[in-house]
């Protein structure tokens, strides 16, 4: 008896085969970046803007693969992609350290290029939205001078109590600068980027770029048909069963 995974793989293969038989050009259209943007908008997914994002730098190994891969494919045209990677890894491990130096130099130069591009694309002094409480804490930093022996935790607790007292003693505080839900200030863009990297692990971030196809499912087939603009006039009796 087949496992659930095997049955789902077989079902997905059948669905994709049926779709491709009805729309011969669907793969070409599906991989088109403009189509991915339109489709993402149709199903409510906002594509990530990668217009001004500098291209990441390559490692020494990637430069090596870029140079050696064509010769491996030329020697073995029927080789599978995963086997190509095996051959590349083997050749890289056997490559003398002296011969690796040129790829190390290429990697260093490419990293300089990336860092320079990244620096040029930074938007310094971009406004950030913070709460009224944080603005209040920023204004009350002098508490550290009054109580130099307090720990950071104690200072935070004291500021919280002061904030609660401020709201009680100032019923109209909503009309003050602390009353706004968010206060616009300027911040150091580079520091903010570092903070985001430390707070949100890259593996937990939701990414959506046009080059990565969205998963095909039965509920999205209609949207695909409308965006492609093709008809099933020649195959009216053919249906996709999921």
Swiss-Prot record:
Residues 54-122, 126-197 bind DNA. GO terms for molecular function: DNA binding. It is found in: Host nucleus. Its main location: host cell. Keywords: DNA-binding, Host nucleus, Repeat. It comes from the Viruses. One of its GO terms (cellular component) is host cell nucleus. InterPro entries: HMG_box_dom (IPR009071), HMG_box_dom_sf (IPR036910), HMGB (IPR050342). SMART domains: HMG. PANTHER family: HIGH MOBILITY GROUP PROTEIN DSP1. This is High mobility group protein homolog.
